Amino acid sequence: MTESERGQLPNDSSPPKEHERRRVSKLQGLAAFSPDALASIGYADQEIYLGLVVAGSVGLSLAFPIALSITILLTLLALSYYQICQSFPSGGGSYTVARANLGTVPGLVAAAALIVDYLLNVSVSLTTGVDAIASAFPALWPYEVELSLLLLAGITILNLRGMRETGIVMAIPVYLFLLAYLPMLGYGVVRLSIQGPVSLASTAPLAIQPLTTYLVLRTFSTGCTAVTGIEAISNGVPSFRPPSTKNAGQTMIIMSLLMGTLFLGTIGLTQILGVVAGPQETILSALARHLVGTGPVYFAIQAVTLIMLTIGANTSFVGLPRLLSVMAEDRFLPKPMTKLNSRGVFSNGIILLALAAGVLIIGFSGSSHALIPLFAVGVFLAYTLSQTGMVRYFNRERGRRWTAKALLNAVGAIATGITFVIVGYSKFAGGAWIALLLIPLLVLLFLQVHSRRQEADVALHASTASP
């Protein structure tokens, strides 16, 4: 059983016809699986801005080149995960792919990295969402922690109750988000063509640090959070209507194009228009205010951004309990993680995620900027392991055009592996060490639980076999 086979729908015991009825179209699938990926511009743009603004106009002039390099990485990942969609019709998450092709320990490392990723996605998304709305209503800034915890409590309760008709619930905010940002970007391009670019030298603050290679690497590493969430569709291939692999693959490409457009568009306009954020404002808020003014449209954009980031956080409440249940089925976690409550959800996993995310929000004072260094480490470790597993898969299966497919995943694995090293090095002191320490500790925990459960099985078998 894979990460996506269990828990795709509210209750795994529902009849086959019900499963078929709940399969999603490409438009529904885009809404269901893309929120955290599309909403990642909320924190990726901000981290690139914060990383470069300390070097003044010279630093900010590198925003678009850095975003372009990250978009190239996004393209490699999109093509790689497109292949995973085609090769694993039952769902191909990092844990599944790595364990099946690289072995148990690499699979557990991927699982540990995913757990860290899911946890940080909740904390970062909710705190970034609060930043978005506080940019519109500055009086809310002192209440970042409280508001983040309030949002966390809300989505926890909704998930414990079981959100059965998630398609429509997800689709409305996702498409509102696209309807808010894509026209705004289009208007920005038109305005740029009429008024021309604005020199950053006239708007950027004075540099307080020199522009160094280390600063650029550090900014690149935090900006790479823009590619988080791209794996979600490969996890959910069975949820798509037949032909599921084709529909999932096409949805992956559409999502990646939207991610690239939003990311490059917002970063590009910010740089070319010379947009600079105030001390209590996100860079996306500053861009929206610059383009549409401080009126109803601006406030609507900020509200939609908050909602989108909250839904992005909710994807972890679907993915992590499912992953924990699969690992418990594989005997690497306690059996209670497989239990569904009366509403057909993995309540133990949901509660565990909510508690851990709450601790992080409180421990880091509701600061998404402080949480980001922990985030990217697990993401790129999981990406590297899954793509390395795909190279092994194609080398073993040797199907049609297997050499080209293996080469693509190899290039992707090398790219994400290098990015993992850059993130670990440049953000180690900033908090990446916590994730780098937590991942092996989780692997040791999984192995310990597996050993204990095997011992218990042996003891139970011996007691039942004795006369």
Q: What does each model-found stretch correspond to?
A:
Residues 1-52, 79, 90, 98-100, ...:
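Membrane-interface "cap" regions at the ends of multi-pass membrane proteins
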Residues 30, 203, 336-347, 383-428:
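C-terminal membrane-solvent junction of multi-pass transporters and transport-like membrane proteins
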Residues 49-99, 105-113, 124-151, 256-260, ...:
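Extracellular loop-to-transmembrane helix junctions
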Residues 103, 254-312, 337-365:
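TM-loop-TM module centered on a large, flexible mid-protein loop between adjacent transmembrane helices
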Residues 104, 142-149, 239-262, 325-362, ...:
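Loop-to-transmembrane helix boundary motifs in multi-pass membrane proteins
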Residues 155, 160-190, 252-255, 372-385, ...:
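Membrane-interface loop-to-helix entry segments
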Residues 175, 180-228, 426, 430:
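Helix-loop-helix junctions that connect adjacent transmembrane segments
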Residues 177-203, 267-273, 384-399, 448-457:
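Hydrophobic alpha-helical segments and their helix-loop junctions in multi-pass secondary transporters
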